[in-house]
Amino acid sequence: MLTSFELVLIKGHKDTLAKSGKSYDTITLAEIAQMAEVPNRLCKLDAPALIASTYNAPDARSHAAQREHGCFHAFVLDVDEGNTSLKQLNQALSAICGDCARIVYATSSATADAPKWRAIIPFKSPVTGQEYEQLQQALFASLAAHNITCDQAMKGAAQMSFLPNVPPDKRGEDGAPKYYEY
């Protein structure tokens, strides 16, 4: 079951509210799950992204601010190397995390010959920004024991992670994704 807490939503890689005094919009895991079923059709850098924290103040994209104020509700990982299949990733996550809820989807740069994955795995209880970075490191080490390499940048408390998206150049003439799994 996907709970209803609201995570930081970033509208494209240039979206910054640091000097605006405004808070970032938010998104729920249920909304992300719906997006995984019908991914966005945007150029990668214009696509929405998330930070797995509920701290959405104007400085939410700062690692220091998220470490200090962040309340994190999910692991987020990127698997960009190693030709890992969706089945292999799900088996490894089940071995490590048990029968847990998760959203796993192909990234915007994935192809059938070079699959790449993003996974969002909710916690039972929220953790601080410092705890989040430590837990991310532990999960990545556990996945490495299953021969799955995670993008180490995702350990950062304010690291944004793109949401489900298949850009126009990765779609056929009919608009359907050339490759997308979730």
Predicted segments with their positions:
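Signature for HUH/AEP ssDNA processing cores
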Residues: 1-115, 121-134, 138
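Generic structural signal for short, solvent-exposed loop/turn connectors between secondary structure elements
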Residues: 83-85, 171, 182
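Short linear, low-complexity motifs centered on an aromatic residue
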Residues: 134, 138, 176-182
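Secondary-structure boundary/capping signal
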Residues: 100-102, 147-150
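Contiguous ligand/interfacial binding patches
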Residues: 140, 144-148
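Generic secondary-structure boundary/loop-capping signal
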Residues: 47, 52, 120, 151, ...
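Short, conserved secondary-structure transition motifs
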Residues: 110-112, 127, 149-180
